[in-house]
Amino acid sequence: MSPKTTKKIAILTSGGDAPGMNATLVYLTRYATSSEIEVFFVKNGYYGLYHDELVPAHQLDLSNSLFSAGTVIGSKRFVEFKELKVREQAAQNLKKRQIDYLVVIGGDGSYMGAKLLSELGVNCYCLPGTIDNDINSSEFTIGFLTALESIKVNVQAVYHTTKSHERVAIVEVMGRHCGDLAIFGALATNADFVVTPSNKMDLKQLESAVKKILQHQNHCVVIVSENIYGFDGYPSLTAIKQHFDANNMKCNLVSLGHTQRGFAPTSLELVQISLMAQHTINLIGQNKVNQVIGNKANVPVNYDFDQAFNMPPVDRSALIAVINKNII
């Protein structure tokens, strides 16, 4: 048998889907192929890696995927990947196919899975795929800017009816435990104030803030992060609405939910993805392994796992103060 000369990479998407994941597959495949690297896709994330669900990239038609949301290769929750024997089988599946490098597109849990695989000798690269923007090694994550656009579009629609009927609108956005979607969404839509995990408001504080806004105008639009109301002793949004309605502040609740994952990636999103994908393939060409790729000021950057995991989150208190200046 002749010795293997062509490098092989496997790519998987993991965690919650994010707009731009498909575009990342497209760009990685394009740049890898032009560098004479053979590409495989792993279906259904780490679940598929364990179950050996690898297919050559040329078997999937990506021609309509650049502008589509979701992930055409799937993503499944797979808590069993925490078990060493499961990861060992996943690593063995890569080894038997002579895969040289694994590229993981996902959030912080996906990154940890890659780090654990790297400890078993798998050469890994991670790209930040999550709408939550909670990967500290990247200024913006893949999907965040597009989710932000979906918030802008939906809040714009909510604003018109809220103003027409002189109401209070509470718009809940995603973000898990990161407030960036709420903060940047509030900035993009000129919302009256914002509530995030770093500036939580109880019912009394929320009511006081709304009343301050209503002193100057007949409507109020509030953007709140998910996982605040209805948790840790805070009233549910339904209870808040009932309280406001009973106190002559008619309230509409709008939870944007998974619509934030469903928009086609924006132009800037695609530009950043293209640059990060090219950077990833360049790192593979240099055999600089076990790297976390991100972007800073629209320039691709890379760090090793320990560097990336030890980066602190960005302090958004100044931005929150700007948004909430009328309720302070």
Curated annotation (Swiss-Prot):
Keyword Transcription: no
Subunit note: Homotetramer.
Name assigned to this protein: Probable ATP-dependent 6-phosphofructokinase
Keywords of this entry: ATP-binding, Cytoplasm, Glycolysis, Kinase, Magnesium, Metal-binding, Nucleotide-binding, Transferase
Pathway membership: Carbohydrate degradation; glycolysis; D-glyceraldehyde 3-phosphate and glycerone phosphate from D-glucose: step 3/4
GO MF annotation: an example: monosaccharide binding
Lineage, top ranks: Bacteria, Bacillati, Mycoplasmatota, Mycoplasmoidales, Mycoplasmoidaceae
Species this chain originates from: Mycoplasma pneumoniae (strain ATCC 29342 / M129 / Subtype 1)
Cofactor: Mg(2+)
Binding site for substrate: 130-132, 167, 174-176, 226, 258-261
Residues involved in Mg(2+) binding: 108
Disulfide bridges in this chain: none
Alphabetical list of Pfam families matching this protein: PFK
Residues the record marks as active site: 132
Transmembrane region(s): none
A GO cellular component entry from the record: 6-phosphofructokinase complex
Entry's localization field: Cytoplasm
Residues the record lists as binding ATP: 16, 77-78, 107-110
EC number(s) reported in the record: 2.7.1.11
Main location class: cytoplasm
Catalytic activity: beta-D-fructose 6-phosphate + ATP = beta-D-fructose 1,6-bisphosphate + ADP + H(+)
GO terms under biological process: canonical glycolysis; fructose 1,6-bisphosphate metabolic process; fructose 6-phosphate metabolic process
